[in-house]
Amino acid sequence: MSASYVSDLHINVKGVPFHLCKEMLAKRSSKVSSLLERNEIDELRLILRDLEVDPETFELVARFCNGSEFKFTSDTIVSVLCIAYYLGMNEEQSSNNLLGKASEFLEHRVFPSWSETINALRSGDKSFDKLADVGLVDVFFDSLIEKASYDPRLLGELIKNRAETDDYRPNPRRRLFVIDWKSEDLITIPLRLYEPFMIRAIKSRSIPVEYIVLSVCKYAKKWVFDTEESLSGQKREAIEVVERLLPYQRGLISCELLFESLKHSIWLEASSECQNGFMIRICKQLDMAKSTDLKILSRGYGEKAEGFENIELVKTVVKSFYTYYANEDSETVSHFVKVAKLSEEFLFLAASEASLKLEAFVELAEMTVAVSQGILSYSDGIYRAIDVFLESHRYLTESEKMEVCKVLECGKLSQEGFERAAKNQKLPLRIVVNVLCVSQLQIRDTVAKEIKGMEEKVDEEEEEEIEVSSDEDEMEKMSNKLLGLEIENDECVVHRRKNMKKKKKKISVWGQVKRKFGCLNSSSSSYSVDACTCDVKKKKKKIHHHYE
């Protein structure tokens, strides 16, 4: 080396001074060696200015250069790799150099473990930009994807159905890593690494989509819902990433999380694409929601926020649902029924809230009436909500009570609803009278329908009797004719038998006489038969003439 080398090099790392031997450092680092050859001492002192290096990590590098004992950890390995790569501490400069040793530790001690890999990825976040050329980030991602493909539970535990067993059977492949049951959670890595990792995992198609969704939902809860309000900028970025990563498939995401996400996206003033994305997902499965999910939208923002402050957002969601399912079919009709019942349940839930204003209740009630029109047969749900609202707002005047009750369609109450409303002392007197009148009209209509039905039934029975009697007359006539024919037939048979006996008797006597005379032959026999036949025919004619 040049004689101009100064033995000591003073470097400050975040206020911590380090005294290094230039010759020892130049032996391991090609970059330091090059600067010393050009005698650029000032540049050498600022050699680490472009790196995000902490004193603990640089101390490992210094100990390695001095030949002292050192120890890698998953917390420091990425930063050490970054320094070694930046300073050119490779095998070309010196055998058994720092870059090779750090790479070996990464391969054999970090990558086999899910938790160690997550820890290294999280700790070395700021150093990855300097390692973009070598593709180290992709190596980390592929390692994690392989582990998650083998056992998706590393991303979190799904809520199991009763039919499912507790045993999970991983993919039948050779395992080249260890499974950490108390593992580090993927959602702890920085957002700028989490999003590209999840995109890469989705494209790989090797991890079940349910586990992808589970991880993204956990990320939203940690970095959007549960963080401090002062970090609104970071939360806005996080909610937009969450929206981009979530699928649109119906039923994969819980309604609770979708409602929370929509509310926060509006509060954080996220992009319109983000807000619309959550709205579309909600519309796809609003029929699967609960009344408590709708309450999330109506609740204000902040820790002291009360429920039912934002009724307009609830109305917007319900309206968007019907716009989304504009083309009716057999499947969407069932969705409409469920959403109509959901609106009634939400109205009932809101009615018990003492802080709910009259105007807000009326708006919700009108919305419920609109979505129930032509869908639900009875308005008992709206009546129950009105009853609860009047109970929790006993200070209302008679005119205000009338304002509340104007949405009630008395004609759509069930019989049980009529009975309850007629005895309800909280209702305005005019409403009770209206209920009684409608009830009487319905009873009258019911009785009239019953009478009409009975008359129609009697008429039908009389027509049936007439038809039966006419049929009986026809049957009697037919029976008489058949009886007459049977009598005629019997008489014919009797007469024929008598005539045959007489003829046979005559033929036999005459035949004997002829035989005695010896004049019986075939011709005479034939004649006798013909004569007999003629005689029978004549008698038959006489018989027919007799019946005629």
Swiss-Prot record:
Residues 180-442 form the NPH3 domain. SMART domains: BTB (SM00225). SUPFAM superfamilies: POZ domain. InterPro entries: BTB/POZ_dom, NPH3/RPT2-like, NPH3_dom, SKP1/BTB/POZ_sf. It comes from the Eukaryota. Pathway: Protein modification; protein ubiquitination. The BTB/POZ domain mediates the interaction with some component of ubiquitin ligase complexes. Belongs to the NPH3 family. May act as a substrate-specific adapter of an E3 ubiquitin-protein ligase complex (CUL3-RBX1-BTB) which mediates the ubiquitination and subsequent proteasomal degradation of target proteins. This is BTB/POZ domain-containing protein At5g17580. It comes from Arabidopsis thaliana.
